[in-house]
């Protein structure tokens, strides 16, 4: 039993609220326990220079945190004049994850810009961002279909993500901040609804981990992501 009462294989309470931002083509507030992220999807009728004239689209992402999303204030990266390495890594991960499930040839020469803004951080902000951004992306693309700008939804399948780790020698799912800070191993899994992996990130913070521990974490992640797909599907069906 974990300190918050969850079992080793239990997600935190996950909620996804659609149409959270008035002006965005797609938007959600995604909550994994006390981690809260606003994800928006904006449609632009242009593509990066390397795609111009090729008749294909693009999906990319930006990620940021409010200065007081964490226990102590962090200066805005805009004030520093550059994007930090962690931020750059996370926003590239979000973009890759979403591009993995979009048929760019059906999107036409359009870009979908995903913005993930963490308003409260308690572990798992990148995995929550991916899971919520998928729903915002679906809403933005469905809007293009409804307006007749796309003939069909260019989504191949769903994508979601979750964290796992080894805490106190035990494999656990969906780590919060306290667990993440104490974890001997920290991993993130990104998967599609056809049970394929988009990305697996893992680091031993203390002792190296065994194949058996890796298998235990993978099993927890696969089961947890299946639950996230069900949540996404239920939210999109409303």
UniProtKB/Swiss-Prot annotation:
Pfam families: RNase_PH, RNase_PH_C. Gene3D superfamilies: GHMP Kinase, N-terminal domain. Phosphate binds at residues 86, 124-126. It catalyses: tRNA(n+1) + phosphate = tRNA(n) + a ribonucleoside 5'-diphosphate. One of its GO terms (molecular function) is tRNA binding. GO terms for biological process: rRNA catabolic process; rRNA processing; tRNA processing. Phosphorolytic 3'-5' exoribonuclease that plays an important role in tRNA 3'-end maturation. Removes nucleotide residues following the 3'-CCA terminus of tRNAs; can also add nucleotides to the ends of RNA molecules by using nucleoside diphosphates as substrates, but this may not be physiologically important. Probably plays a role in initiation of 16S rRNA degradation (leading to ribosome degradation) during starvation. HAMAP family: RNase_PH. Belongs to the RNase PH family. NCBIfam families: RNasePH. This is Ribonuclease PH. It comes from Geotalea daltonii (strain DSM 22248 / JCM 15807 / FRC-32) (Geobacter daltonii).
């Amino acid at each position: 039993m974990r300190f918050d009462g969850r079992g080793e294989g239990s997600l935190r309470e996950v909620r996804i609220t659609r149409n959270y931002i008035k002006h965005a083509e797609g938007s959600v507030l995604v909550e994994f326990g006390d981690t809260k992220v606003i994800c928006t999807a904006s449609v632009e009728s242009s593509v990066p220079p390397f795609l111009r004239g090729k008749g294909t689209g693009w999906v990319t992402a930006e990620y940021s945190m409010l200065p007081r999303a964490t226990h102590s204030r962090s200066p805005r990266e805009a004030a520093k004049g550059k994007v930090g390495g962690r931020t750059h890594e996370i926003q590239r991960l979000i973009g890759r994850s979403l591009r993995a499930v979009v048929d760019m040839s059906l999107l036409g020469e359009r870009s979908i810009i995903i913005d993930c803004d963490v308003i409260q951080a308690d572990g798992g902000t990148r995995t929550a961002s991916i899971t919520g951004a998928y729903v915002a992306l679906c809403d933005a693309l469905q809007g293009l279909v409804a307006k007749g700008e796309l003939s069909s939804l260019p989504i191949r399948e769903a994508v979601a993500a979750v964290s796992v780790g080894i805490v106190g020698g035990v494999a656990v799912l969906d780590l919060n901040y306290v667990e993440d800070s104490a974890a001997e191993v920290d991993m993130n899994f990104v998967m599609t609804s056809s049970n394929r992996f988009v990305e697996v990130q893992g680091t031993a913070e203390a002792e190296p981990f065994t194949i058996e521990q890796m298998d235990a974490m993978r099993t927890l992640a696969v089961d947890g992501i299946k639950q996230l797909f069900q949540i996404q599907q239920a939210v999109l069906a409303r």
